[in-house]
Amino acid sequence: MSGSKLSTPNNSGGGQGNLSQEQIITGTREVIKGLEQLKNEHNDILNSLYQSLKMLKKDTPGDSNLVEEKTDIIEKSLESLELGLGEAKVMMALGHHLNMVEAEKQKLRAQVRRLVQENTWLRDELAATQQKLQTSEQNLADLEVKYKHLEYMNSIKKYDEDRTPDEEASSSDPLDLGFPEDDDGGQADESYPQPQTGSGSVSAAAGGYEIPARLRTLHNLVIQYASQSRYEVAVPLCKQALEDLEKTSGHDHPDVATMLNILALVYRDQNKYKEAGNLLHDALAIREKTLGPDHPAVAATLNNLAVLYGKRGKYKEAEPLCKRALEIREKVLGKDHPDVAKQLNNLALLCQNQGKYEEVEWYYQRALEIYEKKLGPDDPNVAKTKNNLAAAYLKQGKYKAAETLYKQVLTRAHEREFGLSADDKDNKPIWMQAEEREEKGKFKDNAPYGDYGGWHKAAKVDSRSRSSPTVTTTLKNLGALYRRQGKYDAAEILEECAMKSRRNALDMVRETKVRELLGQDLSTDVPRSEAMAKERHHRRSSGTPRHGSTESVSYEKTDGSEEVSIGVAWKAKRKAKDRSRSIPAGYVEIPRSPPHVLVENGDGKLRRSGSLSKLRASVRRSSTKLLNKLKGRESDDDGGMKRASSMSVLPSRGNDESTPAPIQLSQRGRVGSHDNLSSRRQSGNF
């Protein structure tokens, strides 16, 4: 071993000295050399003795004893030399082995040091990983709580009476399937419904091919079933119609392509994108073969394929299809047609999902120019396109440009609803008042909109679709942008107006549904606000105490012949301690959530129904009965009295001549009754 010491006799004084391993090995090597020389000398002497011994045995046998003794001594010395040489070689091998052991030991020590360091690192990493695991478990628990909360909120969303049409709209909006009146080829919420055209223009736009009326009816029926998620009815209906068309007209017929498009729409709603894609490819081949490669129907099918690829996230595959559809529409319809603008919007959306923002801006700006030129600056598509362009600006961080577009939309809506007067300093768009409040830090005393809430009247619902009101969306987006800039007071004003706009939009949709159910002529109806103003004036002039309130949607014919009121009666004031409900005998209590309505069966009793379709059927039956009864007893009525029909429940009170109080409900609910109206009028209870 290196550095080890061995004791050996000292030549000078016979004392003990310490030798290192290297010195011992060096001395051993010298000893081996000396022993080798002695061995060789002894071998030479031994050989000479052997020769002398042979000669003496021949000449004088008596003198050979001395030589033999010498020979024995030399042989013993030679054996001792060989033994010494062997031991010296063993010592040399042992020294070499000790050196190897020492080197291995040093190597193992270095490895131990490295392993100790690695172990320290691993312990640190393990501690960090355990900390991350603990944090992840905590986040997972929080996410589970949030997920359950969102699940609950989603479950009760359908019971929210203040939901706007955009919240109620489903993802089953029709695609561009070749039906001009349903030409909606946008993706999801980015769609742009186009103005309806007559049958003549439809035929002209289709290049002489007009879609049969039966296919239009079937399309609307399938859309209705799909919107109700009744795919088990819609799919067999489409397949049967497709089979019949193929038998009568053959596979390569435009009607077959149209039916393939309808079936593709149903499969799209079921998220069966592969089946829908196969059908659209088949329809595209048929239309290209029968109608030509530059036909508008081919562009519609290409657009549908692009939408389908977009829904699957295949934006690169969808972009060339959308561009080809754009080229066809520009060639057939002209570069300034609204359908071209709609296609530009779809193409911009695909490019936006790929991050091609320069192309996105160009497409949106060109679409905006077309809409403003052909449809006018007040068309809803202009505001929608500006909103989409502003969204693209936001994704690029161009907040100033987005803010400018939002303000343009709100300013135009303000001018359209309230007008613009340079003399009236208070007649300003809502964003101006919001920024003034932000600067002053308080509400203005002379706010022209009544705490800024009346501005929601400017948020009109697009009558051609159930998409969200553009102005309401703009209010929310600009409010979010103000919050990003730290303008919290201004954001609160816009958000408050957006909330009131949602409720106003819901009322307008309900009014439209009521008009459709009752078959009223929209052009001869007095607006709801005027009818309700007349009702309030009549109540104030009569001095009738207001024990209960009735929220109603009223319409009055301009000729004064009939007034129709659809009302919901409930208690105007409720005490916190009194939760009891005053409901006449024979009627059913209407809970608020989930919302149900009371409809009347044939026996005159009310039953609860939670289906809008059942409500419509009941309203139609009740309206028919009411009209028949009114026609049969029209001569008995006073000519100066205005006839009225009410869908509100009028409880019977026997022969009491006093005015019946409305039904008092602690929660809102809709009620309908018509069958006993004439009998009540005759008995004096009307």
From Swiss-Prot:
Record's subcellular location: Cytoplasm, Cytoskeleton
GO cellular component, one term: cytoplasm
InterPro entries: Kinesin_light, Kinesin_light_repeat, TPR-like_helical_dom_sf, TPR_rpt
Record's comment on post-translational modification: Phosphorylation may modulate the process of mechanochemical coupling.
GO BP field: microtubule-based movement
Major location category of this protein: cytoplasm
A GO MF term: kinesin binding
TPR repeats: 215-248, 257-290, 299-332, 341-374, 383-416, 472-505
Coiled-coil intervals: 20-160
Keyword presence, Phosphoprotein: yes
Pfam (any one): TPR_12
Keywords in alphabetical order: Coiled coil, Cytoplasm, Cytoskeleton, Microtubule, Motor protein, Phosphoprotein, Repeat, TPR repeat
Positions of region (Disordered): 1-23, 158-204, 520-558, 586-686
Biased composition (Polar residues): 675-686
Function of the molecule: Kinesin is a microtubule-associated force-producing protein that may play a role in organelle transport. The light chain may function in coupling of cargo to the heavy chain or in the modulation of its ATPase activity.
Similarity field: Belongs to the kinesin light chain family.
Domain notes: The light chain is composed of three structural domains: a large globular N-terminal domain which may be involved in binding to kinesin heavy chains, a central alpha-helical coiled-coil domain that mediates the light chain dimerization; and a small globular C-terminal which may play a role in regulating mechanochemical activity or attachment of kinesin to membrane-bound organelles.
Complexes and interactors: Oligomeric complex composed of two heavy chains and two light chains.
Name the UniProt record assigns to this protein: Kinesin light chain
The species this protein was found in: Strongylocentrotus purpuratus
